[in-house]
């Protein structure tokens, strides 16, 4: 709790994060706090999250969108693709920009955020974004792999780390 206090009345910020259970009472409480002046912070804006077996659950972004719509206030996201989060992660790992690789399954958060920071990007097709979705984006990852497991291939891993590719976009699998 260093540096912050959790309060029920008149908080400076309402932080919305991932959760498996959400109750309408909590949403109403957050909405009223924001309408009384609290700022809305989102830990991420993912609209949904894969849970396996081809199934999904609503993500943090779905709940944030509901509260934004109800309050007319826009959240500040500190998660992907926020430069704040990307920069903090890189600095925490003590890496230079050209040494940083982001492996992710979502074009609109993982790849967008990392690409905008100049990181090498690897999209894995085993999560949210599928191959047929790629044409809708105006940007592309540096590498596309079927599964994160493919990074166990030593040759591929070395190519990703060194980013020595003949083409900007490498499809593997």
What are the language-model segments listed below?
Residues 1-173:
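Asp-based, Mg2+/Mn2+-dependent phosphohydrolase catalytic module
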């Amino acid at each position: 709790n260093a540096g912050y206090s959790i309060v029920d009345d008149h908080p400076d910020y309402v932080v919305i994060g991932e959760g498996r259970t959400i109750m309408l009472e909590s949403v109403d409480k957050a909405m009223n706090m924001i309408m009384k002046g609290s700022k809305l912070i989102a830990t991420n804006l993912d609209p949904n999250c894969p849970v396996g077996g081809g199934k999904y659950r609503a993500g943090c972004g779905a709940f944030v969108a509901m509260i934004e719509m109800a309050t007319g206030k826009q959240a500040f996201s500190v998660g992907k693709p926020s430069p704040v989060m990307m920069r903090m992660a890189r600095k925490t790992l003590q890496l230079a920009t050209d040494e940083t690789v982001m492996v992710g399954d979502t074009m609109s958060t993982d790849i967008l955020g990392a690409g905008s920071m100049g990181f090498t990007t690897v999209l894995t097709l085993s999560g949210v974004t599928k191959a047929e979705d790629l044409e809708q984006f105006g940007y592309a990852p540096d590498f596309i792999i079927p599964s994160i497991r493919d990074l166990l291939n030593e040759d591929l891993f070395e190519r990703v780390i060194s980013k020595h590719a003949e083409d900007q976009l490498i499809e593997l699998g």
